Curated annotation (Swiss-Prot):
Residues bound to Mg(2+): D20, D22, D179
Modified residues (N-acetylmethionine): M1
Activity regulation details: Inhibited by calcium ions.
Active site: D20 (nucleophile), D22 (proton donor)
The protein, known as: Phosphoserine phosphatase
Residue sites binding O-phospho-L-serine per the record: M52, S109, G110, G111, K158, T182
Residues that, per the record, bind L-serine: D20, V21, D22, S109, G110, G111, K158
Effect of E29Q: Loss of L-phosphoserine phosphatase activity
GO cellular component, one term: cytoplasm
Effect of substituting T182S: Reduces L-phosphoserine phosphatase activity by about 99%
This protein's encoding gene: PSPH
Length: 225
């Protein structure tokens, strides 16, 4: 059983930190915002709530929601241009401080790559450090499904990405930070998990995370010591 002080040491000495995106790095759930633009917000946010609670296998929940939304390429571009996601207060400073310390920062999301890459660019995170789901479109821009081969399309996908990062870059200590059950499940293989409740509190995560924060300032403070 890792103590809180050991967790703090792990975070302080980590060589890689992975963040979830929706409701963690950004304030919104990207899929719900996309549903809003496509006019099916209510039905989809109810499905998201069920999926986040871990009641439905991730890929099934994603397939079901996307079948309802049917987002076109143009609608995705419109979302990014007209209603870009809002960064969670403190995240820009935290990522920048980690990068100054030569810590590799990754975004691992069950959301969509086009939206997550936009978020990454605001945080100076290279697109190569982004793992997310890819939407597919027909030549006329209509929705054609999503790439089911991405690890993030599966339940347990975030853990698969972290395992892959360890194998590829030989990281000694990887920290996963996120708001949801799928983030908590990624530890192990992550060496530590920090639950984040600054945008939404998921009771299951709050109850089970050994370290739970509601403000990124707390983590910034850990790096100053």
């Amino acid at each position: 059983m890792v103590s809180h002080s050991e967790l703090r040491k792990l975070f302080y000495s980590a060589d890689a930190v992975c963040f979830d995106v929706d409701s963690t790095v950004i304030r919104e759930e990207g899929i719900d915002e996309l549903a809003k633009i496509c006019g099916v917000e209510d039905a989809v946010s109810e499905m998201t709530r069920r999926a986040m609670g871990g009641a439905v296998p991730f890929k099934a929940a994603l397939t079901e929601r996307l079948a309802l939304i049917q987002p076109s390429r143009e609608q995705v571009q419109r979302l990014i241009a007209e209603q870009p996601p809002h960064l969670t207060p403190g995240i820009r400073e935290l990522v920048s401080r980690l990068q100054e310390r030569n810590v590799q920062v990754f975004l691992i999301s069950g959301g969509f790559r086009s939206i997550v890459e936009h978020v990454a660019s605001k945080l100076n995170i290279p697109a190569t450090n982004v793992f997310a789901n890819r939407l597919k479109f027909y030549f006329n821009g209509e929705y054609a499904g999503f790439d089911e081969t991405q690890p993030t399309a599966e339940s347990g996908g975030k853990g698969k990405v972290i395992k892959l990062l360890k194998e590829k870059f030989h990281f000694k200590k990887i920290i996963m930070i996120g708001d949801g059950a799928t983030d908590m499940e990624a530890c192990p293989p992550a060496d530590a998990f920090i639950g984040f409740g600054g945008n939404v509190i998921r009771q299951q995560v709050k109850d089970n995370a050994k370290w739970y924060i509601t403000d990124f300032v707390e983590l910034l403070g850990e790096l100053e010591e």
